[in-house]
Structures are given as C-alpha cells and as structure tokens.
Amino acid sequence: MTGWIIYNGTLNIHKINKLVKSLVTEGKKLNIKLEAVKNTEIIPTYNNEGKAELLYLKELESPKFIIFWDKDVLLARHLEKMGFKVFNSSKAIEYCDHKGLMHLELSNNDIQMPRTILSPMIFDYLLNSEDYLIKCYEELGKEIIIKESKGSFGMQVYLIKGKEEFIKKVTELNKRNVDFIMQENIKSSYGKDIRVNIIGNKVIGAMLRESDKDFRANISQGGKGKLINLTTEQEEIALKVHNVLGLDFSGVDLLFGEDNKPILCEVNSNLNFLSFEELWGKSFGAEILKYILEECLW
C-alpha cells in the first residue's frame, strides 16, 4: 500500500524532519510505502472546467491515504476534494491551528477551559479604543495569558503582568495585525500540564510535563516529561475534546485546576510524539499507521 506524508517544505525544523523519517521507517515495517512529500512539491490547481487537480514537482505514486503533517489547510481540503482520504481531516486541522476557532468549536460542550476572550478584528490600530482592553483586563485579572492564534511548541504565548504591560502587548499585536486570544492565568498549573496522546477513540498514553524555569511546560521550552496514569475525569475530557473536533490522532493538553480538576489548555493535530515515544518505549507512529490501515479497509 502506498501513502503520502505531507509536511511543510519551508520549515527546516529538526524534530519535524525526524518525525517524518520515523513514520516512513515504521511504514516499511508494515509493508507501507510511505512517501515524504513537501507541501511545495505538489501544486493545487483547477482546470478550465473547475476540476481540482495537482501539478507535481516530482514523480509520485497515487496514494491510498495521506497523512497531513502540516497546517496548509487549503491544500488538505483540495486533496479531499480530489477524493483522497486525509488524516487528520482539513477541518480538524483548521480547528486546532487557530486557538480562537478551537475554543469557539469546543464551546457549549460542557468542557472546562480557562476564561477566554477573543480579540476583535482590527483594521487600524490607531482608531482602536482602549475601553475594550480595560474591560478585558478587569475580567481576566492582573495576570493574563495572551496567545497568538497560530503558534506551536509553546511559542507566541505570553504571561502578562499588570495593565500597562497588557495594553502594550495587545497594541503590538494589533500593529502586526495578529489574531490572538486572552485568558485568565491558571496559577495552579504554573509550569506543569498533561499531554494526552490519542489515536482513534483510545488514549494511548499520557505524559506529565513540568518546568521549573518557565510558566510553559512544553518540552521544546525546556520542560521535562514523565509517563503518568490519567484519572477517569482527565481521560474523559481529553477524549471528548478529541471527538468534538473530529480528530483521528491528537495531543490534548490539560491544565491543573483547583483540586487538580482538569482544564483544557489546547489541542494539537500535528503533535510532536517523539518525546512521548522515548518514555513509552514503543512506536506511537506505528500505532497511527495501524489505525489508518484499519480505516482504509472500510
């Protein structure tokens, strides 16, 4: 069986390249010819009759399935239009890639999350009133988490202390025309969270991530991980989030609320599972491929 794994051709990030290679290697063990394809090596196009097609920069076999390890949502949707089976789906990737959209989609589903405010659309920051900023500041408290709507590995996330710093950061983001969300700071989860790794409708394993140097617990930001057993409540909320967003595989990040109550932090469709694999001692990538094989038999 032939499959593609699509990744971004303009990012030269070692951990992504390593992850792609590991999936290709695991594919060989399962008699899957998994071809690594940069998103810049296939060009989405529409002919004069409006039919979705591809231009190829290299010779490729037609795939039975496509693992989409990128956030090029338009390309993913284009491939779906052409009839390819894409994991994760373009819609699920879109929800996870935009933090505001993720919270919007998960709202009204009885899922605990930090109090969150979406940034308004700004055309000219010079015409923007500070009234809404003051209101947001009063609602969220003196310590506020600001997250750019698009960002990975714990980057583009800021812990803001005080009104002056808050207004300064929001003004800077507005100048750059960046979407963002504003959240209350869950102090009980400072420097620690849980990454729940899910495939299909099953929790494969979970990792406690802790940092004694930063409010973010991401491994990429210097955090350390160890395997843990989830409580029933933690597992239920992670699976619920995963299913509401329609994901095939995901990494759901949970915070610790008061009395260790699980609170959603965010969801990753293109999760970096290498750190988890090192602790687990098994191949998470192989489990993804086994799941896809089962799905492709239907």
Where are these regions (language model features)?
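Active-site nucleotide/adenylate-binding loops and adjacent lid/helix of ATP-dependent enzymes
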Residues: 2-9, 14, 20, 91-183, ...
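Short beta->alpha connector loops
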Residues: 69-73, 164, 187-188, 248
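Short glycine-enriched loops at secondary-structure junctions
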Residues: 71-73, 92, 209, 255-259
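A short beta-strand motif that forms the metal-chelation/ATP-contact edge
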Residues: 195-198, 260-275
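Conserved N-proximal alpha/beta basic substrate-recognition cap immediately N-terminal to
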Residues: 10-121
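A long amphipathic alpha-helix within ATP-dependent nucleotide-binding catalytic cores
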Residues: 179, 215-264, 286-298
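Protein kinase-like catalytic core scaffold
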Residues: 144, 204-205, 250, 263-265
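Phosphate-binding site of ATP-dependent enzymes
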Residues: 155-241
